[in-house]
Design a protein with these regions (language model features):
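Conserved ATP-binding/catalytic segment of the ANL
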Residues: 137-150, 154-163, 167-229, 233
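Hydrophobic alpha-helical scaffolding
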Residues: 5-8, 24-28, 59-66, 138-139, ...
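C-terminal boundary motif of the adenylate-forming
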Residues: 189, 205-209, 226, 245-282
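Alpha-helix/helix-capping structural signal
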Residues: 33-36, 63, 174
Length: 330
């Protein structure tokens, strides 16, 4: 079952109703944010009209997968017959004919806690100590039978150890031959070879970073999106999740920060990388907001309460600029 993104954004209920109306097993899905939007936008009255019991494969890919989103979606729609084991985290890209890893089918998603401090140095520790700051990753499944996956150092082209983050390289029958009439880019992207091993395969360089654990692929982020602050690697989705989970009101009211409407990125100022965090907040909160910069740069630091909340969860540095915007601005 397929639907245009515009039609979905107009009415997330429309997507679920189309699934409900199919008289047979349904395989369809979307990125993580699609499930988050369904949780927040579909009403109880609309849920009462849905039968999602035949939704056998609910694929989730194209962006970082959040286990909390999967759990929230199940809790929100279990009354419609939706099954938790229908969730199907997967990984793919157009150059690999969309599907590279996924599943297993009819089983709960697999997740893993790693040491958040060590991954900033591209080191994977799947047994973090009790006092370590942890990061939860959802597996994107096992490689398809015809696919070969290597985790490779993008600078040396040598295969990484099992405890290192590297670039995801893919080889297999479903990988495209190259880009039409772009020979130089085709050679750079589709004809990569692993150095130091006997392997005649040509590999597709995905530009995505990750690692393999127990034959499950974990995607940590995209190489071009990495924010490098003081020699440490920070993934924008981690910063965005931290800000989304922060509560500037200290529990007094519903958090004004809109989940999923936060953007973290870096800019260069005087050849130095600076972190910028932009967040959509409730319009009423924006009027009295003192913890954010309102769409303009400032030398002042963010409020320490909000900053400390973020530090406890993930961040090891202060944002250089925090921007607050009204709804639908980001």
């Amino acid at each position: 079952l397929m639907m245009t993104p515009f039609a979905f954004l107009q009415s997330p209920y429309r997507w679920l109703k189309a699934i409900s109306d199919v008289q047979g097993p349904v395989m369809t899905g979307g990125p993580n944010f699609a499930y988050e939007i369904c949780v927040s936008k579909v009403t109880e009255e609309q849920k009462a009209t849905l039968d999602l019991s035949r939704w056998s494969v609910a694929s989730n890919g194209a962006e970082p997968i959040n286990l909390e989103t999967l759990n929230r979606f199940y809790e929100a729609f279990k009354s419609t017959g939706y099954k938790a084991q229908a969730s199907f985290p997967c990984y793919g890209l157009a150059e690999g004919t969309l599907f590279v890893t996924g599943g297993p089918k009819d089983k709960a998603p697999i997740s893993l806690h790693i040491d958040a401090d060590k991954i900033e140095k591209n080191v994977i520790d799947v047994k973090p100590t009790d006092d370590a700051i942890k990061r939860l990753l959802v597996a994107s499944g096992t490689p398809a039978e015809e696919q070969s996956i290597k985790i490779v150092n993008p600078n040396t082209f040598r295969e990484c150890s099992s405890t290192q983050v590297g670039e995801i390289w893919v080889s297999g029958d479903s990988v495209a031959k190259g880009y039409w009439n772009r020979p130089d880019q085709t050679k750079e992207t589709f004809h990569a070879r692993v150095v130091g091993v006997e392997d005649e395969n040509h590999y597709l360089r995905t530009g995505d970073l990750g690692f393999l654990h127990d034959n499950q692929l974990y995607v940590t982020g995209r190489e071009k999106d990495l924010i490098i602050i003081r020699g440490r690697n920070h993934y924008p989705q981690d910063i965005e999740e931290t800000v989304s989970a922060a509560d500037p009101t200290q529990g007094q009211n519903q958090s004004p920060i809109r989940v999923g409407n936060v953007a973290a990125f870096s800019i260069k100022i005087d050849d130095e990388e600076k972190l910028v965090v932009a967040a959509e907040v409730d319009r009423h909160y924006l009027k009295t907001c003192k913890r954010f910069t309102k769409l303009q740069e400032t030398d002042e630091k963010p409020d320490p309460e909000l900053d400390e909340s973020g530090k406890q969860k993930y961040l090891s540095m202060d944002p250089d600029l925090v921007i607050a915007a009204v709804r639908q601005a980001i």
